């Protein structure tokens, strides 16, 4: 597939966001005590990983997650709670 450079850069940004959120949701699931919430978080992590895989088909490139963002939201979840961290994360996603 032939895409222009501007589109490719945007897809790479989205791709990095998807893999970052996949890993983050998996980490949040690891600290979640409620089994049903843990299951939901793992499902979201798998969905995000699927989005990453789809985007990778278009970009043809592996991309590393944003480890700083993962660390930031992980510690926000540990200190202020998972719900707060997820709402904050969703807010930053909508403004992007």
Give the location of each predicted region.
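Non-heme di-metal
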Residues: 1-96
């Amino acid at each position: 597939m032939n895409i222009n450079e501007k589109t490719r850069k945007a897809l790479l940004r989205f791709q990095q966001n998807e893999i970052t959120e996949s890993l983050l949701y998996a980490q949040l699931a690891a600290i979640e005590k409620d089994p049903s919430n843990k299951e939901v978080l793992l499902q979201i992590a798998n969905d995000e990983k699927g989005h990453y895989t789809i985007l990778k088909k278009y970009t043809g490139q592996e991309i590393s997650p944003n480890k700083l963002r993962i660390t930031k939201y992980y510690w926000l979840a540990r200190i202020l709670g998972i719900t707060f961290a997820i709402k904050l994360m969703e807010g930053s996603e909508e403004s992007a």
